[in-house]
Amino acid sequence: MSPKAAARVTSERQKVLALDTNIFIYHFEENPAYAAFTEELFDKIESGRVRAVTSALTLHEILTGARKAGNPELASLYRNLLGSFPNLHFVAFDVTVADISSDLRARYGLRTPDAIQVATAIHQRAEAFVTNDEGLRRVKEIKVTVPPAAG
């Protein structure tokens, strides 16, 4: 098999995970209950063993948190880090995600941000949506994975 063909097969088999905002926050804050999980997850993403997608809403929520805390330098650091993180793709809110998210919101009574995040995962054909929100397990259109807490 040629190197080009091998690369194509490898990329076709690459696992795609969608990440909720809380996974990033736990990682940045080094939350002891989830530090081992997020460290391993982001190592896999950075090395290319896993490809990650998340809604642009994630960036909005992370930057808002830093700015509300009065820390524009931290917001800038997060923006630069996330914008250049390998194998992480931010997905814009578009009409397709709007359609899917409105259906999820109506069907499951999800809050709008949760519906947008899950709709983004579905639209991107992610294998799973990784979140710490147990309530999202009721969504049947995608596998919802909640990381185990240490301790």
For the regions a language model picked out, list residue spans one by one.
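Active-site neighborhoods of divalent-metal-dependent phosphate/nucleic-acid chemistry enzymes
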Residues: 2-6, 12, 39, 88-134
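A short, flexible beta-alpha/helix-coil linker loop
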Residues: 24-25, 59, 98
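Short, well-structured N-terminal submotif of metal-dependent ribonuclease cores
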Residues: 1-54, 67-76, 80, 134, ...
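Short, function-defining helix-loop hinge/capping sites that tune catalysis or transport
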Residues: 28-30, 122, 141
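Structured helix-beta-strand junction loops
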Residues: 47-49, 84-85, 125, 139
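Short acidic, glycine/proline-enriched helix-loop-strand junctions
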Residues: 65, 74, 78-100, 106-107, ...
